[in-house]
UniProtKB/Swiss-Prot annotation:
Residues that hold Mg(2+) according to the record: 18
Keyword line: Amino-acid biosynthesis, Aromatic amino acid biosynthesis, ATP-binding, Cytoplasm, Kinase, Magnesium, Metal-binding, Nucleotide-binding, Transferase
Family: Belongs to the shikimate kinase family.
Encoding gene, per UniProt annotation: aroK
EC number per UniProt: 2.7.1.71
Conditions for induction: Constitutively expressed.
Record text on subunit structure and interactions: Monomer.
Name assigned to this protein: Shikimate kinase 1
Record flagged with keyword Translocase: no
Enzyme class at the top of the EC tree: transferase
Pathway named in the protein's UniProt entry: Metabolic intermediate biosynthesis; chorismate biosynthesis; chorismate from D-erythrose 4-phosphate and phosphoenolpyruvate: step 5/7
Length: 173
């Protein structure tokens, strides 16, 4: 991979976007960004608080602006928020400005990986988490698939193994 293309990770919460993104960036000697962490840096508050204060629409507007700005950089790995693909603008920008890798996982893995995480505003509601994750999957999985250049299942694999798979796929394309 002579020229450093941007690599954008999409997928549901708990798929491993941030963990795998950091590993991938380290292995490729690229800068790593996480759209949720960027929002937290800029607001000085965690995403759950921003979500509560501004509502989902306000949060998504903020997320769209952050992703637009980050995707204009060159040679980065970006872990996007699970719901960022709801924005057509964001989907178009991700597709046009880099290689989109869809990290796929099962609902069971999502539940296991997110059960103790307090930074998941969509899971802190009255509805049981499984039902929330199933509804989100029905809504978002087609959007991830629509823009994915590469799809990789992350269940039962370490971040390093998945990062190596991504690198191999990028080198063979």
């Amino acid at each position: 991979m002579a020229e450093k293309r941007n690599i954008f990770l999409v997928g549901p919460m708990g798929a491993g976007k941030s963990t795998i993104g950091r590993q991938l960036a380290q292995q490729l000697n690229m800068e790593f960004y996480d759209s949720d962490q960027e929002i937290e840096k800029r607001t000085g508050a965690d995403v759950g608080w921003v979500f509560d204060l501004e509502g989902e629409e306000g949060f998504r507007d903020r997320e769209e602006k952050v992703i637009n700005e980050l995707t204009e950089k060159q040679g980065i790995v970006l872990a996007t928020g699970g719901g960022s693909v709801k924005s057509r603008e964001t989907r178009n920008r991700l597709s046009a400005r880099g290689v989109v890798v869809y990290l796929e996982t099962t609902i069971e893995k999502q539940l296991a990986r997110t059960q103790r995480d307090k930074k998941r505003p969509l899971l802190h509601v009255e509805t049981p988490p499984r039902e929330v994750l199933e509804a989100l999957a029905n809504e978002r999985n087609p959007l991830y698939e629509e823009i994915a250049d590469v799809t990789i299942r992350t269940d039962d694999q370490s971040a390093k193994v998945v990062a190596n798979q991504i690198i191999h796929m990028l080198e063979s394309n």
